[in-house]
Amino acid sequence: MSHVQPVRVGRIEIRTICEGWAALALADEAPGQTVDWDGERERRPWAFVGTDRWRWHVHAFVVRLPSGMTILVDTGVGDFPPYAPWEESVEDPWQEVETADVRHVMVTHLHADHAGGTVIGGAPAFPNATVHVHEADWSAFAGSTDADDYVARHAMSSLLELGMLSITDTDREPVPGVHLRHTPGHTPGHRSVIVTDGDEAVLLTGDLLHLPTQAAHPGWWSSHDEDPQLGAASRRLVLWRAAQDGWRIAVPHFARPFGSVGSKGWLE
């Protein structure tokens, strides 16, 4: 369930699952950087709450491929304990998704708002799916405590025991037309996903983009990035390619998650 209408890119259909939203303080988002927040609010009022907070949404993406296969990019928070950040939440956001029909889950990174929903009540949320994770994230968070460190690493260990987890360290195409691209910086093993149909493509960024301002200023970072400089390098490269080739873009934390990028930044 979502407030966002599905989009089509070629024969690819993309729907969002919106779990809810929270209002986060702008002062915490861009440390050490000078941002014209008043100008940003004028350009994109939908992205802000009042004068000092932005509207942080959590979207997962349901992608139906031309072959008819259903895949997911990220899974949202799910019932990850004890995280409940919502200003407003959606009751049973997955009610319109046949979870047994999902064949692959592309986890962009192991933060709980992206991977927490892979496991529900200790059991696989998507029982017939292979769940894809980059090895660098799996290793980096091996010593974490899930709730304290806000990652779903240990919760997902049950998927490994069941043989449902694919942990790899290369860019790859696990399904025809679905490309996993290593875009480190936010986390060591952060991935973005590019889904193609002929000459058309959609880039599902993960947290490569966290704020709309970063589309025009890819060198700006979020306070949530573990390696800000590496994240900026990943962002510059991928957004340059997206602009050159006219890719559609889907961003999980934007209130309006679908758009594209041009010379002036984020385009709806």
Regions found by a protein language model. Name each.
Residues 111-114, 179-191:
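Active-site glycine- and acidic-residue-rich loops that bind
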Residues 200-268:
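Cap/insert and terminal regions of metallo-dependent hydrolase folds
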Residues 3-95, 192-211:
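Conserved beta-strand hairpin/beta-sheet module of binuclear metal-dependent hydrolase folds
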Residues 83-85, 116-125, 261-262:
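Metal-dependent catalytic neighborhoods of phosphoester/phosphodiester hydrolases
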Residues 19-20, 75-78, 110, 136-137, ...:
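Active-site metal-binding loops of divalent metal-dependent hydrolases
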Residues 88-113, 125-182, 230-246:
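Metallo-beta-lactamase
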Residues 71-73, 106, 131, 202-204, ...:
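Residue-level marker for buried hydrophobic side chains located in beta-strands
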